[in-house]
Design a protein with these regions (language model features):
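Structured non-transmembrane domains adjacent to transmembrane bundles in polytopic membrane proteins
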Residues: 1-138, 286
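Alpha-helical membrane-protein architecture signal
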Residues: 70, 74, 78, 107, ...
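Hydrophobic, glycine/alanine-rich multi-pass transmembrane helices and their short helix-loop junctions
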Residues: 95, 99-101, 197-254
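Membrane-water interface of transmembrane alpha-helices in multipass transporters/channels
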Residues: 105-115, 134-156, 216-231, 244
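Short helical (or helix-break) motifs at transmembrane helix termini and adjacent helical loops
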Residues: 158-178, 200
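Helix-loop junctions and hydrophobic alpha-helical segments within the transmembrane domains
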Residues: 179-201
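Interfacial helix-loop-helix hairpins and adjacent transmembrane helices
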Residues: 242-287
Length: 287
């Protein structure tokens, strides 16, 4: 086994063996040239687990062999998040679709909301790879280029989806209220954006400032989280919510509120209660 392992590219030095007190267990340690995030080291772990260990111990009864260490642990964590990411996305997207479908009694609005949220998330992921994996701004931000930590995309996706969906529902609620009062969709969009723009901008500015502080810290993982969330909120608040959302609402017009006939049984839901227009000042009494 040692000959085959040491023959792999990236291995260095002879192994060290330690036996347990009862002589039933042995720990054999090998040294690899790269760090735990080195892709070559992950390939070595995969090959040892897939080929070398089964070929060496597979025919021996009552013998268990395990491959551990920093590189093996990192590989297991990466594989865990890779397997779980589709399930997380399916749950978040599916639940968001159902809630928006019931809230706005439209099948177009939830589809459009999910696509817009995925757009801002994808843009954030692209910038994250450009800066941290490709090394752009590495000197300015004070880090060494390397792979994105495996849990960072999952955290960014879930946190950003919650924040952006909150902004989205806030805007759409005001648009729907204006439309329910009889305004055409185009005018309702303009009124909804005018009412919510100040609140959305202020909330986004606060979140961007908070996340940007994370980028100044020394830990690369925190830098990645802060940068990804700050850029995502910036894109979401300035481009997606302020430009793409109202543009698509005006282009689709009344199609925004289309609901198939077989879903007309859905209940009417009021998200934030009825908000009436300000009442007129009472006129002074006259004799």
């Amino acid at each position: 086994m040692s000959k085959r392992i040491l023959a792999l590219e990236g291995m260095s030095g002879p192994p060290q063996t330690r036996m347990s007190v009862d002589g039933k267990d042995a720990l054999v340690s090998y040294v690899m040239a790269g760090g735990r995030n080195d892709e070559r080291n992950r390939d070595i772990v995969r090959e040892v687990r897939r080929d070398i260990v089964p070929a060496t111990f597979g025919a021996l009864p009552d013998v268990n062999a395990y491959v551990t260490g920093d590189a093996a642990f990192t590989l297991d964590v990466v594989d865990f998040y890779a397997r779980g990411m589709p399930q997380v996305m399916a749950f978040v997207l599916g639940l968001s679709f159902l809630l928006l479908l019931v809230a706005f009694r439209s099948i177009v609005i939830p589809i459009k909301a999910i696509l817009l949220n995925l757009l801002s998330t994808g843009a954030a992921f692209g910038l994250l790879v450009l800066v941290f994996q490709d090394g752009r701004l590495a000197d300015q931000l004070g880090f060494k280029a390397g792979p994105i930590e495996s849990f960072v995309p999952v955290f960014i996706f879930t946190i950003l989806f919650g924040l952006s969906m909150d902004y989205h529902v806030f805007i759409l609620t005001r648009i729907k209220e204006a439309r329910d009062r009889g305004l055409p969709t185009g005018e309702a969009v303009a009124r909804g954006i005018a009412i919510t723009s100040g609140t959305i901008t202020s909330a986004a500015a606060i979140m961007i400032t908070v996340f940007a502080v994370f980028v100044t810290l020394d830990l690369v993982i925190i830098k990645q989280l802060g940068f990804g969330l700050a850029t995502a909120v910036l894109i979401d608040a300035t481009i997606v919510r302020s430009m793409l959302l109202p543009a698509t609402m005006r282009l689709l017009g009344e199609w925004n509120w289309w609901l198939p006939s077989f879903l007309r049984w859905l209940p009417e839901v009021t998200i934030e209660g009825d908000i009436d227009e300000p009442a007129a000042e009472p006129a002074p009494a006259t004799a």
